[in-house]
UniProtKB/Swiss-Prot annotation:
This is Cuticle collagen 6. GO terms for cellular component: collagen trimer. It comes from Caenorhabditis elegans. Residues 187-199, 273-282 have a biased composition (Low complexity). Residues 142-171, 189-212, 216-248, 253-279, 282-320 are annotated as: Triple-helical region. Residues 146-329 are annotated as: Disordered. The gene is rol-8. GO terms for molecular function: structural constituent of cuticle. InterPro entries: Col_cuticle_N, Collagen. The keyword Repeat applies. Nematode cuticles are composed largely of collagen-like proteins. The cuticle functions both as an exoskeleton and as a barrier to protect the worm from its environment.
Amino acid sequence: MDVKETEEQRQMRRIAFVAVVVSTAAVIASVVTLPMLYNYVQSFQSHLMVETDYCKARSRDMWLEMTALQAGKGMGHRMKRAWLFGQWIPETSAGGGGSGNGGGNYGSGASTGGGANTAGYGGYGAAVNAEPAAVCCTCNQGAAGPPGPEGPPGNDGKDGRNGNDGKNGRDAEVLPAPASEPCIICPTGAPGPMGAMGPKGPPGPKGSPGEPPQDGKSGDDGMAGQPGPIGRPGRDGMKGAPGAAGRLIPVPGPQGAPGKPGPIGPPGPKGNPGPDGQSYQGPPGPPGDSGTPGHEGRAGPNGPAGPPGDNGEKGDCGHCPPPRTPPGY
């Protein structure tokens, strides 16, 4: 039974197809867009960190230049013993005289700003700090160390404040009761279209054994078949009676083939003795097996000292950020 497709079914099919296409396009767009957005945010964060480090480095350089200018003018200034942005301030630099210019502060001043190593005469003694090893990097800092251990979890935060009460709803309205429609008795409608075939049901119970069948009747004789293949030959017949005696008719024939060789004759008499043989020197024989190894000899004297080895690899500044130079350099 053919089921005709209605207009509503065709419209629902179009809507379902459009919904599937739109959802598939949205999933593909999200799969492509999210990694690109994440990559952009990560690159922007890296660029922002580089710019922040550059600003910190410029600020540090400005402070160092200001300190050097104050030290060059001979102004007594009491500086705090501390680290500047996590960087070491060498005491032998031009700005190190801050701890030695003022005689009444920490130590006696020096012409090169190295007064931190001399004893003061008006107040406290000079601050004794170990000089760091000389570095070749312009950033004056080493590579980043390994990450530290994970810290303990923080305390739970305080509960938030209760939210504001919601607005009052609208007042209810008294609606009239819906008008009752008159009861209409409709006639029985036409049967609907035949539904799809349902799934196969479970197997039924086993039936009782049937009655024994009756013997069938013999069929009619069939048609004659094709002739069979040729049979095998029969056994040999009995031996016949002997024939008549033959007659000898002498006729000269051809010469026959030579006969077989006769047996070996008896050995002949012993011959005369031959002359004496001559001796020749044979080739040298193969070398003999190797003997057992001898005892280990005494240890020899120590050799002279070898030449000095090559110098080790020099440090590099691969961990330093690229310099930020103004346009035109």
